[in-house]
Each structure stands twice: as structure tokens, then as C-alpha cells.
Amino acid sequence: MKRNLITGGLGFIGSHLIERLIYLGEYVVCLDNFSSGNKGNLAKWNKNPNFKFIYGDILDKHEIKFDKLWHLACPASPKEYLKDPILTARINFEGTLNLLNLAKDQKAKMVFTSTSEVYGNCDQIPQVENFLGFVNTKNLRSCYAHGKRIAETLCFDFQRKYKMEIKIARIFNTYGPGLRPEDGRVISNFINQALNNVPLSVFGDGKQTRSFCYVEDIIDALLLLMNSNFKDPINLGNSNEISIIDLAKLIDNKIYANKQFSFMKSTNDEISRRSPSLKLVKEVLNWQPRVDLSDGLDLTIEFEKKKLKKLQP
């Protein structure tokens, strides 16, 4: 049986990946340091003989046997990585370097989850993989964007020098059941605010656009990518754009229809538009997202409602 090592497996995407791999009957080792994510899943997974949890930090060196490495460990929400930008940069550089050396020693295949933020404030829409990107090193978010860029560089260096099988997924905005209300991502913010009957916080005029991909679609793509021979970066996401104000209205209408919005001053590094080109991933992996935004939001909202109901006395 193949052994999968998932770093950051208690995080949002990592937990969904673990669920899928366990469902598929694969052996999973989760390495996580409890810095974020959902510890509650451990009680369920620990009962499975094909699951093992290791408490640890990727900044430390480990001796773990595995055939496939899924490297997801990194602060991924703005609140997390802005809390300690230096640590965020170190995790991306030192942590990724440790894991690359470990994968090299194990002769393992690897998927590294990068981010759409490597493109920076890009005027080219949709964003294609060969766009070199522009990220201002002075911006607060650069610890994350540049951290992922240097991690990608390390992946390519190991790929060339040691002939390793390393795949790089540039993941765009992802949502679904299990998003933490406090993590600062726009969909979790809006759902949490609407469920608590408070005005939805919109930065700027809300005309900036994003595209959102349902998490199970992303998991489908990651599995296809791991099993492919493709070696270049590849976009994973949904190309359908929506303005932030329209997203707020959509979520508000699905919950209470209060139409209460609080417009906040936007930050200087706010990206005006973000949407992936999916041409390459369709050609290489024969993949495209299947869950539309409205249906995915229904599933996410229902999950949050059930969670709130359990917390009520």
C-alpha cells in the first residue's frame, strides 16, 4: 500500500484531501503542528488503521517513510500569515527545503500547493501560467506571495538537479465546508457575519472581482496532478469571476436577505481582479470544476448552520 504524507493536513484543503485518500483506501500520515486547522477531525481519523498523526513542525527535520508527499503546510489566510510574516517566509523557504530533502531521500513523488498570489497584481485576465508576476516586496502580503515563489524555485531546482517528480499547483480562491469563521477569508467572513445577523464587511466599493472554486473540485484536480507526468506550474481554480459586492449580496440573500453591508477602507495592496486561465489544466489533466458557486455556497452554508446548531445550549 502506498504511503501518503500530508503536511498541514488539519488545514482546510488538507483535511478534505485526507478524507478523500482515506475513502480511496490509501494510507495517510498527517504532519501538523496545530497552528491552525481543525483538530476535531483527529478523533474520527485516529480510529482508522490507515491513518497516522505526527505532531511536528516542517521547520524541524523528520524521519518519515512515504511514497507521495502532499506539501500543504503554510499559513494560508491573511490573518494567519500577517500575524507573523517572518515565520511565514521561513515556513515557505526552510520548511519546503526540509521536505524536498526528505522527499529526495525517499525517492517520493511530490505535489506542492502554491498560490495565485505569485502572479501579484496582474492586469492580464485570465492569468496564465507563463505570466511572470509582479509582487511588491514592501506589501504586507508579500511574505506569503514571495514565500511561495521561492518555494516554487526550490521545487524546480530539486526537479532539475535530482530528477525528482515534483508538481506545482497554483491554487486560486477555494471555499467549502470546514472554512474557519475566524480565518479572514471573504466567503467565511460573509457567511459568519450573515449567520450572526451583522452587516457584511466589504472592502472598498466591492467592485473588485475574484473567482471561487469548491474544495472537492480542487481535490479532484490535485489527485489527477499527482498521478500525471506534468512538471510545470498549473492553475487550479474556477474561472467564473464575481464582484465582491455581488458575492456579499448572494450570500446575504441565501441566509437572511437583510441587505446590510459595511463598506471598509481598502488596503493599498488590494488586487483588483483575479481569475485563472484553465486552458492548460483542461489539456493536461482533462479537468474542469463541476460545482457552481451557488450550489457550493448552499453546501457550505448548510454545514455552518449545522455546526452552529451543535454549539447552541
Predicted regions and their residues:
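N-terminal Rossmann-like NAD(P)+-binding domain of SDR-like oxidoreductases, especially those catalyzing
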Residues: M1-T174, E216, L222, R273, ...
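Short, conserved catalytic or interaction motifs in soluble domains
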Residues: S36, P177, N238
